[in-house]
């Protein structure tokens, strides 16, 4: 499937400001800076398992089906309900305060998140 694979962070834009906006502590932000987040995605049709592995052994795994409401968790351990959509080949998570898009561009996973007016971008290369 289009998204299935294991990806490692290659570049980030606006990391510190975005993580502060999410409410992460300075210590946690420091630990995560320049860390190569590993994203593992399994896609089976409209069903996804999306796991991200962070510094210190912290991992988040979200399961969702395109078009169905689900509860998701953020890196800041905040949970929210959302209906994940697929728009023009992009996975889109859109709630009152958070907007996130993910797409494959030239074989790379490109994620753009907006929270509280702050935009963060992470580009990851496929490693498996």
From Swiss-Prot:
Leader sequence segment: none
Topology versus the membrane: Peripheral membrane protein
GO CC annotations, alphabetized: cytosol; membrane; nucleus
GO biological process: fatty acid transport
An annotated Gene Ontology molecular function: fatty acid binding
Locations listed in the record: Cytoplasm; Membrane
Coarse class of the protein's main subcellular location: cytoplasm
Ranges in a coiled coil: none
Keywords carried by this UniProt record: Acetylation, Cytoplasm, Lipid-binding, Membrane, Transport
Keyword Acetylation applies: yes
InterPro entries membership: Calycin (IPR012674), Fatty_acid-bd (IPR000463), ILBP (IPR031259)
Record flagged with keyword DNA-binding: no
N-acetylalanine modifications at: 2
The family this protein is said to belong to: Belongs to the calycin superfamily. Fatty-acid binding protein (FABP) family.
Function: Binds to bile acids and is involved in enterohepatic bile acid metabolism. Required for efficient apical to basolateral transport of conjugated bile acids in ileal enterocytes. Stimulates gastric acid and pepsinogen secretion.
UniProt remark on domains: Forms a beta-barrel structure that accommodates hydrophobic ligands in its interior. Can bind at least two ligands per molecule, however, the stoichiometry is debated.
UniProt protein name: Gastrotropin
Species name: Bos taurus (Bovine)
Source species taxonomy: Eukaryota, Metazoa, Chordata, Craniata, Vertebrata
């Amino acid at each position: 499937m289009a998204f299935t694979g294991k990806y490692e962070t290659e570049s980030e834009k606006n990391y510190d400001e975005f993580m502060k906006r999410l409410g992460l502590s300075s210590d946690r932000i420091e630990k995560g800076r320049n860390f190569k987040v590993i994203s593992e995605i399994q896609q089976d049709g409209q069903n996804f398992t999306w796991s991200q592995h962070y510094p210190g052994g912290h991992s988040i795994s979200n399961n969702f089906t395109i078009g169905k409401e689900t509860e998701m968790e953020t890196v800041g351990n905040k949970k929210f309900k959302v209906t994940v959509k697929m728009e023009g080949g992009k996975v889109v998570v859109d709630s009152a305060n958070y907007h996130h898009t993910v797409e494959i561009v030239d074989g790379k996973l490109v994620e753009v998140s907006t929270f509280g007016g702050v935009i963060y971008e992470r580009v990851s290369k496929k490693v498996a």
